[in-house]
Structure formats: structure tokens, C-alpha cells
Amino acid sequence: MTTSASDRPEAGVDRKLLDILVCPITKGPLEFDAARQELISRGAKLAYPIRDGIPIMLPEEARKLG
């Protein structure tokens, strides 16, 4: 199975993966921030980093939002 370039945002993260990921704390939706390479959870006020195209969904690795 191949993934076309149109299925990938700038970081190389598969768009389908982003569609199914949820915040591990709130189980709510995540927003992709392409500029910062983060997945934002508004409910938990956390930003999960994306490193080398891999979302790091560990709360202890997340950045707290103001």
C-alpha cells in the first residue's frame, strides 16, 4: 500500500493518521500546526511534538499552551 504526496502534510505525517489520532488525556480532537510541527489539544492545553514525521503522544513530552 502506498500513500500519495497529497495525503501527507508538510512534515511527512500521513493525513489519515492525523485524522484518527486524539489527545491521550481528553480523547478530543487535535489540530495540526504545520509551522511548529505540533498537534494541538485545545482541551488539554497541550501541544504534542512531531519529530521526524512521528507524532509523540506522551503528555510528559508535550508543551503546555498559555
Swiss-Prot record:
Positions of transmembrane segments: none
InterPro entries, per the entry: Trm112-like (IPR005651)
A Pfam family assignment: Trm112p
SUPFAM superfamilies: Trm112p-like
One term under GO cellular component: cytosol
Family: Belongs to the UPF0434 family.
The protein, known as: UPF0434 protein RPC_0266
